[in-house]
């Protein structure tokens, strides 16, 4: 098991602007070369799609980086971002509750047809532990899981999970169910996701 302790862990969600797919394709090698520089601290990465899997939404990267300045530089100096592929970026500190990378996921590689999802819950509340709160999603189905944090590393502002599930509704269950979710999260977003990196 790999546990990163050297710096700060960050969740970065770059969301594409409409009509940027051709530019994204043109800059793919530059993007990969840029990410190669952060390989030792990479916890998870990959493209994100609409819940039906049909349309590319953007990409996520979860990485261990030296400090706040390093996190901002990682997100904003990325070639796609600099070239205008993305319309916006969500950058937050994050805590690796499971203490592993996506490459250590017991279920193996999560590809296009393997039921991978990004679950993003935004809102305050208690920091979740490593146990999924819905019986439909077990810890073995969690690729990564942890709270989103403010810069101070203490104030929780949400939860992020990459999970393997049979449906978007099942994936959403990692945050809980019914009133529990509604009371803790102002917004819950679920997207399709798959392992990223060099092909």
Regions picked out by a protein language model, each given a short descriptive name:
Residues 1-199:
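Conserved, structured core segments of small domains
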């Amino acid at each position: 098991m790999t546990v990163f302790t050297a710096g700060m862990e960050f969740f970065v969600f770059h969301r594409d602007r409409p009509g940027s797919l051709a530019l994204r394709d043109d800059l793919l090698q530059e993007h990969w070369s840029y990410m190669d520089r952060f390989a030792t601290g990479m916890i998870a990465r990959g493209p994100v799609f609409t819940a039906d899997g049909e349309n590319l939404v953007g990409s996520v990267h979860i990485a261990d980086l030296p400090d706040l300045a390093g996190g901002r530089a990682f997100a904003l100096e990325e070639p796609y971002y600099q070239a205008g592929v993305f319309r916006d970026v969500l950058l937050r500190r994050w805590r690796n509750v499971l203490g592993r990378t996506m490459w250590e996921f017991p279920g193996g590689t999560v590809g296009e047809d393997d039921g991978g999802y990004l679950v993003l819950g935004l809102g305050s509340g208690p920091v979740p532990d490593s146990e999924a709160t819905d019986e439909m999603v077990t810890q073995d189905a969690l690729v990564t899981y942890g709270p989103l944090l403010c810069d101070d590393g203490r104030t929780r502002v949400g939860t992020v999970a990459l999970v393997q599930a049979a449906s978007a509704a099942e994936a959403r269950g990692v945050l809980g169910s019914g009133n529990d979710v509604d009371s803790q999260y102002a917004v819950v977003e679920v997207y399709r996701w798959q392992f990223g990196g060099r092909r």
